Amino acid sequence: MSLRPLQDRILVERVQETEKTKGGIIIPDTAKEKPAEGKVVASGNGRVGEDGKLIPMDLKVGDTILFSKYGGTEVKIDGTDYLIMRQDDVLGVIE
């Protein structure tokens, strides 16, 4: 199954955080914070402005982004967890 986001939405795969600290301590899943970094895996075409013209997306597939920890809607596709969010929910692109 594949998912194509509509309008100004993007499909994001979270970047997994490390399982161990620098000192070698293993961090259990319950103690991990939700990562606020992810990779854009699909993108909509943009949104329609008040003048009726299409405003294209600034983000593209492959961009690594920073977003609010609790932003987006969680979805599971073929056993993989993703987030769907609006482009406006993205804080920045990591270059």
Curated annotation (Swiss-Prot):
GO biological process, any: chaperone cofactor-dependent protein refolding
Entry's Gene Ontology cellular component terms: cytoplasm
Keyword Signal annotated: no
SMART domains: Cpn10
UniProt keyword Cytoplasm, yes or no: yes
Residue ranges of the TM segments: none
Subcellular location field: Cytoplasm
Main location: cytoplasm
InterPro entries assigned: Chaperonin_GroES, Chaperonin_GroES_sf, Chaprnonin_Cpn10_CS, GroES-like_sf
Alphabetized UniProt keyword annotations: Chaperone, Cytoplasm
Any one Gene Ontology molecular-function term assigned to this protein's record: protein folding chaperone
Function: Together with the chaperonin GroEL, plays an essential role in assisting protein folding. The GroEL-GroES system forms a nano-cage that allows encapsulation of the non-native substrate proteins and provides a physical environment optimized to promote and accelerate protein folding. GroES binds to the apical surface of the GroEL ring, thereby capping the opening of the GroEL channel.
PANTHER family cross-referenced by the UniProt entry: 10 KDA HEAT SHOCK PROTEIN, 20 KDA CHAPERONIN, CHLOROPLASTIC
Subunit composition and interactions: Heptamer of 7 subunits arranged in a ring. Interacts with the chaperonin GroEL.
Family, per entry: Belongs to the GroES chaperonin family.
Protein name as catalogued: Co-chaperonin GroES
Taxonomic lineage of the native organism: Bacteria, Pseudomonadati, Thermodesulfobacteriota, Desulfobacteria, Desulfobacterales
